[in-house]
Amino acid sequence: MFNTTSFVGIDFGSGPNHHLLYFKRGNDHEAWLSIEGPWHVHTADAVFDEALQLQRLIDLRRERVHQVRLGDGHPHLELTFESGHTLFVNGFHEQYESWQAGDARPLGGDQYLLVAMPQGELAVFVEEEA
């Protein structure tokens, strides 16, 4: 869903961990990622200041996703960009969904909808062919 897409926009949510990211590939493929839990952009330094993290995220605008990885034990999501920077989205929370992703706007899925469920489970909804 995210491979070879470019990060093209962000809507800021009500708190420091709530953001909606938009991705696009060509003229016909859109995807979104709603983050509702902790996240950060990996870099060489270990500073995790909120303003700095948002700036790092914004700096990734228009970069292509080079690699996508889901964690083994929990659905931690890692999007690695062509620059080598990685956006890490936590996939575990005791009571709440950590993130959702789909391939249609607004916040839906034409073919895919993925949800990092409470307790670290991943729900995958796939359109069935008729």
Give residue spans per PLM region.
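Surface-exposed, interaction-prone regions used to assemble/regulate multi-protein complexes
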Residues: 1-130
